[in-house]
Amino acid sequence: MKYLNTEKEQGKRIIITVIGPDRVGIIAGVTGILAANDINILDISQTIMQEFLVMVLIADMEKSKIDLSTLKDNLSSKGEELGVRIDAQHEDAFKFMHRL
């Protein structure tokens, strides 16, 4: 079994989740931060459950100049502004937390 030692080898894919009351501007707010930081959206899924938005994004930070910690802070601030919770984590952490 090969162990991945560097961030470059592990990849720069992240999972972003957005949960909260649906309103105008949520997707624009999240994707605006990603675009401004050269973070590419690889996949996106959203649904409205009654009045609540549930959105999951898979994104690639390979070309971004900011680190994941800074991105988390930026997204969290935007979430507070929009009245939703926005979380971001490395793909490996997400897989570990949601394994069966």
Where are these regions (language model features)?
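A conserved regulatory-domain signal marking ACT and ACT-like small-molecule sensing domains
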Residues: 1-100
